[in-house]
């Protein structure tokens, strides 16, 4: 069994935006989708997860609407807004750039400095 990876600070909102960009989901469905996309590797606490959902909705990056879940229960389904799409694009570019910079630093040997 592979060890779970602790989610780096500041990435949860980006991952929620990505999950919702793949199609509308209720809160728990978003959490499950992130787990699936990570190969069940990320450890996400439900308290911080739902706080992030509400924060994204307040910022206008996702919007919620009441509907019926797959088990016939009332649930709030979230979808990405145009502002959320722009934010996801910006966050993805920033994360990709940062990952490349860190990878470049970590790959350096003493004689390459």
What are these model-predicted stretches?
Residues 5-48:
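N-terminal helix-turn-helix DNA-binding core of bacterial DNA-binding proteins
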Residues 49-56:
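Basic amphipathic alpha-helical segments that dock to polyanions
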Residues 71-92:
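Basic, amphipathic "hinge/linker" alpha-helix immediately C-terminal to the N-terminal HTH DNA-binding motif
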Residues 18, 32, 51, 89, ...:
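A cross-family signal for key residues in well-ordered alpha-helices
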Residues 64:
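Short beta-strand "wing" residues that participate in macromolecule-binding interfaces
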Residues 86-113:
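Amphipathic alpha-helical dimerization/coiled-coil segments
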Residues 60:
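Glycine-centered, phosphate/nucleic-acid-interacting loop/turn motifs that mediate DNA/RNA or nucleotide
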């Amino acid at each position: 069994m592979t060890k779970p990876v602790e989610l780096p600070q500041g990435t949860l909102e980006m991952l929620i935006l990505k999950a919702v960009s793949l199609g509308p989901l209720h809160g728990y469905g978003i959490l499950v989708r992130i787990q699936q996309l990570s190969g069940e590797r990320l450890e996400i606490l439900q308290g911080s997860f739902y706080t992030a959902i509400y924060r994204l909705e307040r910022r206008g990056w996702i919007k919620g609407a009441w509907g019926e879940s797959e088990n016939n229960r009332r649930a709030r389904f979230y979808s990405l807004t145009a502002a959320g799409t722009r934010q996801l694009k910006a966050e993805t570019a920033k994360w990709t750039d940062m990952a490349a910079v860190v990878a470049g630093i970590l790959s350096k040997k003493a004689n390459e400095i």
